Amino acid sequence: MSKDKKNEDKETLEELKELSEWQKRNQEYLKKKAEEEAALAEEKEKERQARMGEESEKSEDKQDQESETDQEDSESAKEESEEKVASSEADKEKEEKEEPESKEKEEQDKKLAKKATKEKPAKAKIPGIHILRAFTILFPSLLLLFVSAYLLSPYATMKDIRVEGTVQTTADDIRQASGIQDSDYTINLLLDKAKYEKQIKSNYWVESAQLVYQFPTKFTIKVKEYDIVAYYISGENHYPILSSGQLETSSVSLNSLPETYLSVLFNDSEQIKVFVSELAQISPELKAAIQKVELAPSKVTSDLIRLTMNDSDEVLVPLSEMSKKLPYYSKIKPQLSEPSVVDMEAGIYSYTVADKLIMEAEEKAKQEAKEAEKKQEEEQKKQEEESNRNQTTQRSSRR
């Protein structure tokens, strides 16, 4: 027996050497646990035997004492003793069942220990707050790096600029007015859109401008030009008058003129602005009926103008009151049977063109008569002066 024990001890030592420290600790723990369970089982067995002895002694004492009692009491005592015996047997059975269960638990613990040695330890999870802090630092840094790299690259100044809506102007004129340079950053155009749109509107032809961006580098300048409302005529030259009240300084070719247009025979900048402003308040039908506008100041009204209509009618109206008084012409027109003059200087009345010619002829005759009288008076004065001079010379010669 001693040899067998020695051999077993040697084998266990060799196994312990081969095992890792953790496995050694695990085996030691399992051995201790098995020893403790065996000790507990022995204590339980001793307690059970002691209980059985006490119960048997008590039952004997009771039997002696109860021998004098009725038969019914003896039967009940027997039943109680039988129940106790049955309970003791049940305790034995439970203990017998617990022993294999404890062995099974030991085997399961060994298996779990082996699995734990094979499995790798689980990685600790990173708390969410640390991830959030790292994100708040890394994201701005990466964004700044990306923006810096973009600004240093040639893509930062790459632009494809197109112009739409030009009729009287050219795309080059619009680009020049915008002030956009090849060296300007694309991001500056996006951030300062309003500034560039305002610069484009510095071109007097442009009524409105819109700078539209399309990814990645395309820009479209959408332009709306002022309309041409009339032409200032000087000899054979025609200068456009815009709806803004601006008079174009360069004339247009006769081939580019529309079939019908409004002719203006004065070029004062303030008067043209007032005329365009008043004209904008008149209906399109009445505008289309006007053929020519010229100044016709009188002694009473300095800004009186004469409008020659397409049907040969003439309208005299103050320039500052044109939008108020001219619409009445549409009501008077059906009453005119022949070309007439509608005078709106003070009140409204009309007369025929023939009467006008007669009146003009009479006025011319009066003016000519006045001029003739003036000439006669001047000649008489000259003659009197000459006669006076002659008399003075004669007197001086006599002396």
From Swiss-Prot:
Domain of life the protein comes from: Bacteria
Any GO BP: FtsZ-dependent cytokinesis
Name of the protein in question: Cell division protein DivIB
Organism: Streptococcus pneumoniae serotype 4 (strain ATCC BAA-334 / TIGR4)
InterPro entries, per database record: DivIB, FtsQ_DivIB, POTRA, POTRA_FtsQ_type
Family listed: Belongs to the FtsQ/DivIB family. DivIB subfamily.
Residue ranges constituting the POTRA domain according to the UniProt record: 156-226
Biased composition (Polar residues): 389-399
Spans annotated as Disordered: 1-23, 35-119, 364-399
Extracellular side: 155-399
Basic and acidic residues composition bias: residue spans: 35-65, 75-119, 364-388
Localization per record: Cell membrane
Any one Gene Ontology cellular component term annotated for this protein: cell division site
Residue numbers on the Cytoplasmic membrane side: 1-133
